[in-house]
Amino acid sequence: MPSRRQEELVLQLLCQGALRALRSSIRRAHIAETLAELGLKISPIDLSRYTYGSHMPKPQKALELLEAIHGSGLSRMIVEQKVSVDEMGVVNVPLLACDLDILLLAASAAYLEFRGLADAVLTAAVNGIPLATLVAWALGAKLAVARRERESTIMRYIEAEIFLSDPPSVSHLYLPAGVLQRGERVLIVDDLLRSGRTLRALTRIAESAGAYVVGVVALLAVGDGWRYAVPEGARVLVLHTVRVSAGR
């Protein structure tokens, strides 16, 4: 379990990363004005120091800044600027899944929503790994990655099927047995929620291990067809929802 000082450092680094993500596309004056409207008056000099890491905000200030960044719509502006959908309804998920600005904003949002609530972060290879890694670090949780193939013939695995519709086929996810422990609180993290099939398979893996899902985090959601797969009682955090007619 991380020490209190480690947790404070993580919070400060998340704040600094979120501010840097904002500065990639938003003027410093607009950031300062928005924060001031929420009662956080920060001088341009201090804002610059926080952004580039020459000086870190105190932990309580860092928490207040993160809450303001996500509560004010500033983080949403960044995501909306970077999401694109082509004429075929294809979302640029692979690019977003490796965009450090987006990942830092998503990880800090997950921290605000799930700090102290998750023992493990579970994802499916491969696009979900970057975000899941950052979220696991932010929460001080272990990382569990389910893959499409068995990596060893002698290891035992927990397995879940995924039924694909186009073309009709069956895929599988495999997680080495013992990675998740009975009674652990699991946060499922993925790059995209669309059909809910991957989410349902990851949920079955967690349940087969005797763990239970406390929440779901995703960079993007397309439509609402995935919501049936959310485990009862689990919280959901989606950075941005795209309205297109396509299936995954």
Regions found by a protein language model. Give the residues of each.
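PRPP-dependent phosphoribosyltransferase catalytic core
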Residues: 2, 7, 204-248
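Residues within the helices of the helix-turn-helix
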Residues: 28-33, 45
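The alpha-helix within a helix-turn-helix
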Residues: 32-37, 66
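Recognition helix of helix-turn-helix/homeodomain-like DNA-binding domains
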Residues: 36-57
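Short glycine-rich phosphate-binding loop at a beta-alpha junction
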Residues: 117-125
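Short, glycine/charge-rich flexible loops or terminal/linker lids adjacent to PRPP-binding catalytic cores
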Residues: 141-186
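Active-site/ligand-binding-proximal alpha/beta "capping" segment
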Residues: 181, 188-208
